[in-house]
Amino acid sequence: MYNNVVSGIFNNFIQNNISCLRFNFRGVGNSTGNHSNGTGELNDTKACVDFLVNEQNIEKLLIYGYSYGAAIGCSTVNYSKNIIGYCAISFPWDFMGLEYKKLSQCEKPKLFIQGNRDRLAIYENFKTHYDFYLDPKRYKIINEADHFYLGFEQEVAKETYEFYRSIIE
Amino acid sequence: MCGTEKIFINNNEIKLEAELFLSSAENLHKATLICHPHPQFLGI
């Protein structure tokens, strides 16, 4: 279970003593099952939300997702009242279709992080997609970063932590 | 990472690989959920 972006965020939360759970979707790493084109993955995220709320007594939950994880994770934002917002890193709207854009619409706080050299979450289309979303929302452009954020992990982690502090603390 | 726990979360017949960190009482009842990317999507 390693990805440079997710590990940067995860480790930064731990260093700041913030409870966090990260997971692999079905069919990835040691998770069982097979990829199901989003339907099953939405349920995977909901299962993790249920685990935190019902088994760990979490009352306020922020969802973070990167790339495919942003499209799926943020699309569960309206699943529970305990989810109070989300942060999407390189939301791949142009590859995922309108369904996930609609599912991730909400009136909860949202942060979108985007690299200006990203060709998977296409930077040139970012503002058009961003404008679709209701307030409260904000975005952060990471200059010179592409979809993989190599060398920019700390900058991403810093933004995600500040978002957490602005919402929860 | 010290202080984390490797777990599996059940989703019906699926077992999801996960890593959990629970903070001290100061931040109890608050958490973040981080969704990994899909390697096929990243082309790796």
Predicted regions and their residues:
Chain A
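Short beta-strand/loop motif that positions the catalytic acidic residue
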Residues: 106-107, 111-114, 118
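Short alpha-helix in the alpha/beta-hydrolase fold that links the catalytic acid
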Residues: 99-100, 108, 121-130
